Amino acid sequence: MAKAIKQLQVGQLVRSLAGHDKGQYYLVLKVAGVKVWLVDGYKRLPANAKQKNPCHLQESKLISADFAAKAQAGNLRPEDMRACLRALLSQQADELNVGKNPDEEALANV
């Protein structure tokens, strides 16, 4: 039984599940067929985007419309990529912490 191909979008936050970059977060720069090109604004820029199989990625629901618009226009700067990535990671962390009581967390660590 074949795995369903993930429907990724430009500007979507993803995490690498396999390879030497396992655990690394990226933004989707381009989707073509069964390959995805990823950037992070640090080591991976559009000129040397990471090519990855979508099966090796954990997708997030978070998408940066600002990143997608700049990628479409072709004027992405490293600082823009880093800012978008930081914003999405911060938003993801906030969503994970919603509804948690800090006092309960402190008691759980005792």
Descriptions of predicted regions:
Residues 19-22:
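Short, charged beta-turn/beta-strand-edge "cap" motif at the junction between a beta-strand
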Residues 1-10, 17, 27-110:
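Ferredoxin-like alpha/beta domains used as RNA- or RNAP-binding modules
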